[in-house]
From Swiss-Prot:
Keyword Phosphoprotein: yes
Family under the similarity heading: Belongs to the RCAN family.
Region (Disordered): 163-197
UniProt name for this protein: Calcipressin-1
GO biological process: calcium-mediated signaling; negative regulation of calcineurin-NFAT signaling cascade
Pfam families: Calcipressin
Post-translational modification summary for this protein: Phosphorylation increases its ability to inhibit calcineurin and decreases protein half-life.
Domain of life the protein comes from: Eukaryota
Biased composition (Acidic residues): 163-173
Amino acid sequence: MHFRDFNYNFSSLIACVANGDVFSESETRAKFESLFRTYDKDITFQYFKSFKRVRINFSNPLSAADARLQLHKTEFLGKEMKLYFAQTLHIGSSHLAPPNPDKQFLISPPASPPVGWKQVEDATPVINYDLLYAISKLGPGEKYELHAATDTTPSVVVHVCESDQENEEEEEMERMKRPKPKIIQTRRPEYTPIHLS
């Protein structure tokens, strides 16, 4: 993995501006830029509205340091302005580093497994045959006791739900008795072709 190395770029400052007018109004922006143009004539500004930051690029590090000493924590339009030296991030390479080779093999089947790797067999599913047997013996309205009660545990009893066939039949009879709604067709609007009129 590449180590990140933060280097300070002493010819650039980052200004934390609390007043949002710097980003929208040209007069306020001109006042802001004039504060720094006294320290360097060949200066450039980069405005980052969503971060409320302005990057100020000076032509030499001495003028940037002088501007920071004089203007750090000063008021601009009634709000405090803070100045910091800009950090540049050097990763070392412009390409992504490959991941660590801990587990770079497929689980099943492995393309190139490590030494001593063995295929893991799937476990058999757990089936409760007592429960299946009890359900197969039950009929509607009956119950089956899986485990008898003891002094410390309750008994486990399976009840079969009764079917809702009677309710379904009643609902179907009601549907048949209801009259079907009549669908009234709408008339087609009058149409006269343009070339005939």
